[in-house]
């Protein structure tokens, strides 16, 4: 019976590359000359530091563009509120990985409401979908992509 898994993961190597490229762009941009600004990757969180809140916003946009170039969905970013410490501003950006239980339940409900001949089951931080025909599984993937749940999903472990 054909099946596949729905997961939400981020390639940490690509994330590190995106942060390094964003730091490199900061060093060459004219509006960040003589400004103490940097991106710092700590595990799966990015710490953004700059001298002003406006610069933090610009830096988030720089990071977003480099994530897109590296095929990391920017919807996985969870930006916390900026904090002012002295003359510097800091912001932590966490990257969501895995599918939490409420989202998994919404996903299963979405699949069941689509009235496709597939079964969905929650298995930890992923959802397994099984069906009799490969076409049903592909229709399920299309329905999930249409739904826009705010979390980037990847489809892997496709078995026939």
Curated annotation (Swiss-Prot):
Pfam families in the cross-refs: DUF520 (PF04461)
Claim: Nucleotide-binding is one of the keywords in the record: yes
Function of the protein: Nucleotide-binding protein.
Gene3D superfamilies: 3.30.70.860, YajQ-like, domain 2
Family stated for the protein in its record: Belongs to the YajQ family.
Record lineage: Bacteria, Pseudomonadati, Pseudomonadota, Gammaproteobacteria, Vibrionales
UniProt GO MF annotations: nucleotide binding
CDD domains given in the database record: YajQ_like (cd11740)
Key words of the record: Nucleotide-binding
SUPFAM superfamilies (UniProt xref): YajQ-like
InterPro entries in the cross-refs: DUF520, UPF0234-like_C, UPF0234_N, YajQ-like_sf
UniProt name for this protein: Nucleotide-binding protein VIBHAR_02358
GO cellular component terms listed in the entry, alphabetical order: cytosol
Signal peptide positions (record): none
């Amino acid at each position: 019976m054909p099946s596949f898994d729905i997961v939400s993961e981020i390639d940490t190597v690509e994330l590190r590359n995106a942060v390094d490229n964003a730091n490199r762009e900061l060093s060459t941009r004219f509006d960040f000359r003589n400004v103490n600004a940097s991106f710092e990757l700590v595990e799966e969180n990015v710490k953004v530091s700059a001298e002003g809140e406006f610069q933090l916003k610009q830096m988030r946009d720089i990071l977003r563009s480099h994530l897109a170039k590296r095929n990391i969905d920017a919807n996985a970013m969870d930006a916390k509120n900026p904090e002012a410490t002295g003359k510097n501003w800091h912001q932590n950006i966490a990257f969501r990985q895995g599918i939490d239980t409420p989202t998994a339940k919404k996903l299963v409900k979405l699949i069941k409401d689509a009235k496709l001949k597939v079964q969905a089951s929650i298995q930890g931080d992923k959802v397994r979908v099984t069906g009799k025909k490969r076409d049903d599984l592909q229709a399920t993937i299309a329905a999930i992509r249409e739904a826009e749940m705010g979390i980037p999903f990847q489809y892997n472990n496709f078995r026939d």
